[in-house]
Amino acid sequence: MSKIKIMCTSTGCIDYAPERYKSLGIDIIRIHVFFNGKEYREGFDLDPVEFYRQLETIEDPKNHLPTTGMPDTEEIMECFDRAIADGYDEAIVYVLSSALGGTYNKICLVAKEYENKLKIHVIDTHLTCFGEGLLAIKAAEYAAKGMSAEEILKETRWSMDHQEFIGVDGKLDYLIYNGRLKGGKAFMGQLL
């Protein structure tokens, strides 16, 4: 039976409840946030409370919104190397939607370098935030029960296909300014 390591990008928000992800042994690959002239690793150098506090102080959101960047190659490699050092045979990495940036592709490229060392399954969740994180949590619970990687992937893919999230954003302006909400959708959102 393979020993399976579960990983997730920081956009999965699982570190909002650190005792939960730590008890399940989930590793987090940190996305970078560029804000107010500084670079942070999401959820590590900049916690959510401080992030939102700083966000509220922005005087000109059109020109000063935070931006994100992919994790460093070295950080991804550290996660994979740690899994190998800890005796894992396989890793399943749940990644934020590839439609939102290049993180999925970057992790896939790094994973190819480990083909003979660790069997890595990189999963484009087509989600972000808690939807992504819930998949990693369920996968870690399944791994703890002794399920195989194939069984875990089957269960979490089913969940991906059947998840629906509804979110409320009190300030659609941020989604419009950063280009995530455009055209008619932006117009309709502002009417609501």
Regions found by a protein language model. Name each.
Residues 3-5, 10-27, 31-38, 86, ...:
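Mixed-charge interfacial surface used for oligomerization/domain docking
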